[in-house]
């Protein structure tokens, strides 16, 4: 039984190559079936994300799996091979556990990868490419990833600007889900902020953007309201939280506009987070009572502290994955011993059945009973001690005292 993991990721390959070896969702079902057919066990799972493509197989040949990957995508070996990594046995188990725990991610400890690995496993089960070993491997991996999350602080601290902005809001407001949020901009960062806000239960979001169409497209996904930049003065007084990230060369929110909004709010506090470079919010806004302004520099300082915290947590997580990979391999070895015992017992029973049938035939032909029984006992003894005798002889000739000792112990010779 041999587990193999072969992959390519953000550390080993360019975006261009990663795109070429990725598997689209509509084709991954058939791809898993095709890959599984190249293994002796019929077990395979493909994990394919924007940052990695990894193939996990049981009883597969490494060279054959790599050849399959290249054939499937029509790629030359010389272009792919230098960017591939491979793991076997416990190393493969440990790698999968590290991946699912976020220890191998572009952003250390990010939680999204666990969901992606789970989704890949579900698709493999639907494709019929999961049996005992792979099933146990992935189920154990999910338990390990959960243990890493609960036993360490790897996911507790924000390490992206978007996540840090939302985390700051959560610390300032006792219940962020009831706040009203104004997002300025509709780029990738604001979209990620909106996702984090939605994940935290925020239902009231307004997105202001230079082009209304872009804002509307984003709002459909998050159930938000789209407005133009010109409408900001009308919506600003209603906002408890303002997060801005545009590409504007000039500030969008001035001190006067914010001051007017605070008066309309009867001086209820307002959190403003400016994650744009150059800045979207005039720095003088920080001088206003009830306005709490944070810039991207403030967030980066938090992120640096949090990254150090995550690295410390990652060291604890590495210990967990190491221990759990050992335990999984113990289970694998127990399976192998069960298979060996079953095979040995079956072989011995076959020898017995053959010799008993031969003895019964002789008795039916009138042979002397005592002679038949003696012959049966001798033949059975010779058959059963043949393989152990050969092993003892070979170990003795080679001077392999360790193997010789193990054989003597296994055969019970040291008890006499």
Swiss-Prot record:
SUPFAM superfamilies: Glutamyl tRNA-reductase catalytic, N-terminal domain (SSF69742), Glutamyl tRNA-reductase dimerization domain (SSF69075), NAD(P)-binding Rossmann-fold domains (SSF51735)
Enzyme Commission numbers on file: 1.2.1.70
Binding site for substrate: 49-52, 105, 110-112, 116
Name of the protein this chain belongs to: Glutamyl-tRNA reductase
Transmembrane spans: none
Gene, per the UniProt record: hemA
Originating organism: Shewanella baltica (strain OS155 / ATCC BAA-1091)
UniProt domain comment: Possesses an unusual extended V-shaped dimeric structure with each monomer consisting of three distinct domains arranged along a curved 'spinal' alpha-helix. The N-terminal catalytic domain specifically recognizes the glutamate moiety of the substrate. The second domain is the NADPH-binding domain, and the third C-terminal domain is responsible for dimerization.
Reported function: Catalyzes the NADPH-dependent reduction of glutamyl-tRNA(Glu) to glutamate 1-semialdehyde (GSA).
Lineage, uppermost ranks: Bacteria, Pseudomonadati, Pseudomonadota, Gammaproteobacteria, Alteromonadales
Keyword NADP: yes
List of residues binding NADP(+): 185-190
Enzyme class (EC, first level): oxidoreductase
Sites annotated Important for activity: 95
Gene Ontology biological process terms in this record: protoporphyrinogen IX biosynthetic process from glutamate
Active site positions: 50 (nucleophile)
PANTHER family named among the record's database cross-references: GLUTAMYL-TRNA REDUCTASE (PTHR43013:SF1)
């Amino acid at each position: 039984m041999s587990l193999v993991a072969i992959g390519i990721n953000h550390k080993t390959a360019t975006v261009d190559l990663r795109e070429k070896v990725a598997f689209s969702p509509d084709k991954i079902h058939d791809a898993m079936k095709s890959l599984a057919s190249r293994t002796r066990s019929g077990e395979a799972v493909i994990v394919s994300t924007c940052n990695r493509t990894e193939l996990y197989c049981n009883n597969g040949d490494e060279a054959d799996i790599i050849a399959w990957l290249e054939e499937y995508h029509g790629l030359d070996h010389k272009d792919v091979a230098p960017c591939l990594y491979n793991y076997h046995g416990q190393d493969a188990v440990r790698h999968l556990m590290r991946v699912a725990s976020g220890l191998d991610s572009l952003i250390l400890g990010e939680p999204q990868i666990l969901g992606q690995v789970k989704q890949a496993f579900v698709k493999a089960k639907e494709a019929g490419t999961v049996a005992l070993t792979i099933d146990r491997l992935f189920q154990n991996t999910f338990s390990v990833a959960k243990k890493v999350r609960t036993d360490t602080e790897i996911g507790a601290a924000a390490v992206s600007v978007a996540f840090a902005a939302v985390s700051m809001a959560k610390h300032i407001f006792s219940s962020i889900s009831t706040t009203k949020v104004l997002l300025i901009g509709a780029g990738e960062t604001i979209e990620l902020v909106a996702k984090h806000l939605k994940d935290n239960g925020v239902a009231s979001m307004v997105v202001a953007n230079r082009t209304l169409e872009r804002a509307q497209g984003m709002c459909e996904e998050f159930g938000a309201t789209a407005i133009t930049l010109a409408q900001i003065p009308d919506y600003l007084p209603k906002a408890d939280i303002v997060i801005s990230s545009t590409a504007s060369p000039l500030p969008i929110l001035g001190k006067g506009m914010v001051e007017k909004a605070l008066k309309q709010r009867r001086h209820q506090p307002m959190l403003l987070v400016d994650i744009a470079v150059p800045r979207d919010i005039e720095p003088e806004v920080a001088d206003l009572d009830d306005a709490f302004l944070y810039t991207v520099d403030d967030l980066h300082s938090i992120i640096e502290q949090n990254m150090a915290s995550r690295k410390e947590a990652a060291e604890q997580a590495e210990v967990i994955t190491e221990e759990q990979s050992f335990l999984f391999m113990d289970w694998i070895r127990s399976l192998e011993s069960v298979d060996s015992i079953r095979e040995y017992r079956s072989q011995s029973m076959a020898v017995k059945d053959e010799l008993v049938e031969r003895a019964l035939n002789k008795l039916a032909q009138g042979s002397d009973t005592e002679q038949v029984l003696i012959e049966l006992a001798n033949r059975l003894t010779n058959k059963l001690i043949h393989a152990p005798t050969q092993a003892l002889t070979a170990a003795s000739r080679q001077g392999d005292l360790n193997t010789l000792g193990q054989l003597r112990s296994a055969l019970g010779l040291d008890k006499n």
